[in-house]
């Protein structure tokens, strides 16, 4: 498993939103973003920025009660999931892997809030941990997870 991390200081909501816009502009279709952080840490703000980066015109709101919001008006579909109200065993019954596998829905970007409640994870994803620290504001730690083999450049 390939794993590195990048920490970004986000002084306010605007900075969190801008990070989301950058992600939305640069991530390819098929990307999965797992978001973790306390209430009010900026998960939904980040997803709203991703939507803006994808040129989605609709208002992006947290799907806390609907569980899944689908936005298809942008250049790539965005599937926004919120697992806050669910237990891990409930999550498996939703078959949300259909979203990252592109089964029954067009391939898009999948953003999952409260990802710690997710049982089975995709093979490749960005794990973003959002924390709030008194002095620094929000911190986003971005960890790309890749189940891929490294190429041995020494082997001919």
Describe each PLM feature range.
Residues 43:
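Conserved lysine of the Walker
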Residues 40:
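Walker A (P-loop) phosphate-binding loop of P-loop NTPases
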Residues 61, 70-114:
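Conserved nucleotide-sensing/catalytic segment adjacent to the nucleotide-binding pocket
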Residues 33-35:
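Hydrophobic anchor at the beta1->P-loop junction of P-loop NTPases
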Residues 4-6, 97-156:
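Short phosphate-coordinating micro-motif centered on Lys-Gly-acidic
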Residues 2-22:
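N-terminal pre-Walker A segment at the start of P-loop NTPase domains
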Residues 31, 57-61:
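Conserved post-Walker A coupling segment in P-loop NTPases
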């Amino acid at each position: 498993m390939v794993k590195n991390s990048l920490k970004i200081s986000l002084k306010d909501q605007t900075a969190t939103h801008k990070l989301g816009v950058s992600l939305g502009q640069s991530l390819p279709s098929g990307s999965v973003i797992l978001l973790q952080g306390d209430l009010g840490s900026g998960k939904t703000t980040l997803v709203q920025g991703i939507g803006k980066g994808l040129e989605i015109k609709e208002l992006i709101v947290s799907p806390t009660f609907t569980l899944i919001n689908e936005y298809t008006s942008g250049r790539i579909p965005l599937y926004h999931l919120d697992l806050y109200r669910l237990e891990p065993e409930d999550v498996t019954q939703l078959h949300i892997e259909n979203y990252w596998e592109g089964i029954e829905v067009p391939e898009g970007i999948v953003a999952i809030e409260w990802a710690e409640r997710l049982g089975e994870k995709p093979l490749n994803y960005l794990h973003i941990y959002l924390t709030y620290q008194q002095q620094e504001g929000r911190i986003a730690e971005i960890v790309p997870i890749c189940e891929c083999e490294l190429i041995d450049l020494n082997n001919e």
